[in-house]
Every structure is written in C-alpha cells, then in structure tokens.
C-alpha cells in the first residue's frame, strides 16, 4: 500500500465488532512498529498486549474511553523505560558482537549511560514522550496496513496501570491503543490546509 493511501485509510476506530484479532497479526504490527526511529537508537518502549485483563484495564479509562477499551478485542498498553542507562546496556547485551562493532558496544555500554545520567526529570520525561509518539504512530499504521482498526487513548489513570497489569514501576505508561475490526464507515477528520502550518524564512 502506498504511504499516502495508508495514511488516508487510518482513522480513529472507536467501536469494534466481536471479530477476534489474530495474535500473530498483533505481533507483526509491533515488529513493524519497532522499525520507528528513536533518539540514540535507545528504543525505550515496551508493549503489553492485553486480552484477559482488558475489563480491569477499561476501569482505568476516563469517560467514553471506558467503552472503547471494554469493546476492543485487544488493547496494547505502551510503556517507556525510565531507566535509560539500563535500556542502553540491554541493547548492547542483546545485540552483542554479531550486530555491533566494539565502538558501538562502548557507545551503548558507557557513553550513553553517562549522557543519560546528566538528564533531569523533565528531560527524561520529554525524551520518553517523543519516542513513544514515534513508535505509536508506526504501530497504528502497521495495523491499518493489515486492515485492523485502532485508536490512541491518552485519557486513563496512569497511576494504576502498572499494578493492574503487573508491570515493573520502572516502566512508565504512555498510551493505550485499542485494536480490532469495525463495520463502521469512518470519515476523515478535518485537516488544516498545509499552507496554514508552513512558514518560510
């Protein structure tokens, strides 16, 4: 599918049918999503595919988001790793000498952790939010490419998600992504004309 066509096909899907979503299709979409760029190639994301605990997770969603999560066959909870130094070292450890030069291994094992140690809390938060946005957009496009609907949800009680899903506190919840099929005819949302958002200097 051409990129323009793919973007035009992507819509916020808020009502889902009972048709199940194949776990293999979800895994494929996540695998494609992780090809997204990330600052320093830090890849600070974690995906939790929620099926059995979806009803519990839905209780944390605000307003109409409750209905969306409740009706979705699958919800993907996207987390980011707040221990950036540990994440950098994990990349070096898992990738190993087969994928990295000695210089690159040094970069992930020592250079990056030293840089991350200088970040204040706000810098870490901004860093994680940016990288979460990059991979989330890739994920919904990957789902769209397989004919699967999705919606990005920001409105939920982030303070309780780790407990409900039994996820280590070091991981920060960023988004809930509801996933499934729909029989609704979805219309594109209004977009500002491109000349309204471009300035030249």
Please identify what each model-predicted range represents.
Residues 1-201:
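Acidic, surface-exposed loops and disordered segments
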